[in-house]
Amino acid sequence: MSSRTARTRGRRPHARRHRTRGRGFWRWYRVVPLVLVGAVAIACAILAATPTTLARRTLYPVSHAQDIQASAERHGVDPLLVAAVIKCESNWDENAQSAAGAIGLMQVMPQTSSELARMGLVDSGAYDPSNLFDPTTNIEYGTAYLAFLEKNLSSTDQVIAAYNAGMGKVEEWLAQPGELADNITYPETREYLRRVSEAYQGYRDSYPNGLVVEQ
């Protein structure tokens, strides 16, 4: 064997090793982009299927958060339920007024606010029952009414239905066999229960850590 042949043969293993490393590099070079593309596709699918927190909060906004939080704490009501009622009652329009005479954010009837004040459930000295276009006052009376209903009824569905149709009517429906939702005879109340329940779940999903107090 010549010295040249020996040297040539001696180099072959190294050459093969370099070629193997090169093939490994190019293999990873081709695979990594595919992995990245797959990861991006999965992320996009997740984002498309599950709205981001920002998108959800656009669908379920909050205004007058400090007033809601304060009244909810004072009366022991979930502030997110208050927000859901406001969204469905007035869509956050503090100047809203119905043909029936319901006023403001939570569409409180003047006779309801007067009765709540008479019962001592709201401090009428601090919150004038006739000033229902004022957001702070309206939220206080609307939240106090939710608290009153919660103390006299046994489920959130009952409370929501009673906020729309009145507690007496809900008690009539409850006296019948079957589920409340099946016994509701007012189409408006049936739809109201569906909408507020959906909004309530939407607010809970959008604010998992509770109401964000921002003005």
Predicted regions and their residues:
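Extended, non-globular alpha-helical segments
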Residues: 21-34, 103-106
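Catalytic glycan-binding domains that act on GlcNAc-containing polysaccharides
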Residues: 47-215
